[in-house]
C-alpha cells in the first residue's frame, strides 16, 4: 500500500495472506491485497481512509466490515488526537459492540515524555467518555518503525511498535 505524509488511502483495502502481492478490485471502493507475510495467515486487516472520508461512507463501512471484526484498531494522530470526526466514528463502532483498541501515531513529535503523557491522558479520557471504559491505548511512531525495518534497526525500540504487535498476535 502507498504511504506518505499526506493521506494515501482513498479506498478500503482488505489485506490478507497470499503468495504474491496482487491487488484485486472486489467492488467499488474496496480492494483486496494479498502478501506473503506470516502473521496474515491468522488475521485479515482492513485499512480504511481517514475518518473524514469514512464519515461519508459510514453506513457502507459499518455494514460490510465492522460487524465482522474481532476488534477495531483505531489510529489517531498525536498532533491532533481524537478529533470530533474520530469521536463520531468511535461512537458508531461502539454501537456494533466491537472492542476498540486505540493507536496513537506520531509520538516522535514530542521532545518531552510529559507531552506524550498529556496526549495519552486526553485520548484515554475522550475514549472513556464515548465507550464507557478506557480501551487499550498504544503510542507508536510509524515513521521510526519504518526506518527500523529499512536499515536502522536501533530505532525499533523507540517506535514502541513491539507492544502493539504482541497485542495483535495474542488477540
Predicted regions: what they are:
Residues 8, 19-22, 50-52, 79-82, ...:
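Conserved nucleotide-binding/hydrolysis micro-motifs of P-loop NTPases
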Residues 56-80, 89-103:
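Inter-motif core of Ras-like GTPase G domains
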Residues 108-171:
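Canonical P-loop GTPase G-domain recognition
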